[in-house]
Amino acid sequence: MQERLRILDQLLPELNVLLRLLDHEFLSATTREKQSAVCSILRQLQPAPGDELDFQYMNTAAYHNGTSFVESLFEEFDCDLHDLHDMQDEYRDSSENLSCQLPPPPSAPPPPLPTTPPPEDYYEEAVPLGPGKFTEYITSRNSSSPPNSIEDGYYEEADNNYPMTRINGEQKNSYNESDGLSSSYESYDEEDEEGKAQRLMLQWPSQEASLHLVRDSRICAFLLRKKRFGQWAKQLTLIKDNKLLCYKSSKDRQPHLEIPLALCNVAYVPKDGRRKKHELRFSLPNGEMLVLAVQSREQAEEWLRVIKEVISPSTGSSPASPALRHRLDLDKRLSHDKTSDSDSAANGENSSLSSGKENRDTGKCRKGGLAELKGSMSRAAGKKITRIISFSKKKQSTEEHHTSSTEEEVPCCGYLSVLVNQCWKERWCCLKGHTLYFHKDRNDLRTHINAIALRGCEVSPGFGPLHPFAFRILRQSQEVTALEASCSEEMGRWLGLLLAQTGSKTKPEALHYDYVDVETIANIATAVRHSFLWATSSHSSTSDLRLYDDVSYEKVEDPKRAPGVAQVKRHASSCSEKSRRVESEVKVKRHASNANQYKYGKTRAEEDARKFIVEKEKLEKEKEAIRSKLIAMKRERRELKEMLKNCSGKQQKEMEERLAMLEEQCKNNEKVRVDLEIQLTEVKENLKKSLAGGPTLGLAVTGKSENPPQKSQQPRSPPDRLLPVNSAAEMRRRSPSIAASSKGKVLQKAKEWEKKKP
């Protein structure tokens, strides 16, 4: 008898385990009947209330279609389940006759997970991990509900594919079960939902949950992350190694997003009438914003406390070093994450949502049509469209053409992060006419988002230890905007440009820089000085940052110009003419019919010619002055040498000292003369190139004195270049007598013959 009791003691636990396994399998009706019979036998063997309850079995088919079995297991652990215990007691009282209870012994291993697949929008909710506690996961279904009020709002279409459950021999479809016996469907009646208490369903983490991800983390939870177009995605979020890590799933090995907390600003936005969630907003260094939704204010305060503990030691030791080391890598990583995030929002969102949300996501999926059209477009058609777009860009406004074409030549454009509504946004910024323009992108310059008049403003570097390369624009001690550059050189360049454009009396050396080390301050100061000198130089100030092509055609000719100013005149003749410079005025004129055609090249040639001729005349005057001075000094030296031959004694010594001093002055003046000769040669070469470019664009250099031309007048310089006439149509378009030749009997006779024609 003792032997049989011992065997029975071994059989009952094994039978208990077998029933547990069968409870999570899809069984036929016959098997369910046998299972119910065995359950009844086990219920008869149930010991008295005072005895040890070693062999109890619980038919989990009566509770939540098999998932309450896992819930019952948490009774053995020290877990605070709040309202879940009350709900289980209610279910237990209402179904005492339908179930039998056999909790596993304390030494038994954790039971296996149900093999039935969970619904599509199940997600795991990680309870905040504290010291000395094991990770707990809470699964919920309604992904659209706020994070602080998880509701059983799951809904599926009715069909015949639902698993069958049997309670006391009666088969029921999951769709037709009552609200207390099924968790696959919950009523959408608003009155019933208001009266229901919030229910949380617990589930053991699977082996694939990668618990090593949260093993060394400071805090972890499944939080809602706001995507680019406003959707919310559930992601495993944790803080580990002073970084914020986001995983799309607990099975992932690599984080989807990794952000060093030392480079972020964190703000908590509580739930209110407009916002339905408690939000943690992370301001990233590249101007983007990461928004995470937490369940309650307490959870938000817990996250903020951990983040503060993580940031405090790193910012206290070296505030600027993390930003200087990781800035570029972080920007690249975040831009990649932003691209992948947008792709997932457009492509992968429909596959993860239930059928009740398909109509809402239909509009978002239509974006793929343009991509398919582009993919199916032939290469020839694509090239044709590219040519059409390029041709249309040539007709843009003068401002856009100036900004886009001179990006490399004039360093007054570039990307800056702008603080807008406590959020950093990357904008394309342009300085023009003492105004700072903000564009959404460098390819869209026809309209600007905002513009700031810089007259009367001040520039103040510094915006906190997390933004070492940020600076502010102030007007009457009030902040107008806050900007942030990508590196120290960019910050210095913009500070110098803004100082010059604002008209402030503050010198670049007087700026005070915080939150950066000594080496970085030296780099910023050097960049500020160079940029400020460039912006205040004659090249930028006299032309007001305009190119030659921005000069209007009406302002080219000025009859009141002083003599000596360069002018180039359009030559109109049936054959080529010698291009030469005369001592009097030389004018630049445009042919009326081709003014628009040659506007770009003619204005450039005109400005180049004027600049080089003025510079050449200046150098020639200096050269003549040095030459006359050298002649006088050499004459004096020769006289001193003659006097030195006839002197002796003390007078001879004074003469020698005077002669040595004169020799030194002659050497210095000779060096100056050589430098002037070199500069003059370079200017002449540049002038020759500018004048050579004029005829190829429809310009010619002709000599015309203020008085009528005389045959006896001889030009000072030889002919530089002939003007070829290669087009007969061009010759026919020209009027026959726009300019007269200053020399040549053949051309003079041809002109007289043209006048005699009727």
UniProtKB/Swiss-Prot annotation:
Location of the protein in the cell: Cytoplasm; Cell projection, Podosome; Cell projection, Invadopodium; Cytoplasm, Cytoskeleton, Stress fiber
Compositional bias per record (Pro residues), positions renumbered to this chain: 102-120
Region (Disordered): 91-194, 335-369, 692-758
Domain PH: 216-312, 409-503
Bias type Basic and acidic residues, positions: 749-758
Comp. bias (Polar residues): 137-148, 342-356
Main location: cytoplasm
One annotated Gene Ontology cellular component of this protein: cell projection
PROSITE patterns in UniProt: PH_DOMAIN (PS50003)
Coiled-coil ranges (or none): 602-690
Low complexity bias spans: 177-186
Key words, A-Z: Cell junction, Cell projection, Coiled coil, Cytoplasm, Cytoskeleton, Repeat
Function comment: May be involved in podosome and invadosome formation.
Name of this protein: Actin filament-associated protein 1-like 1
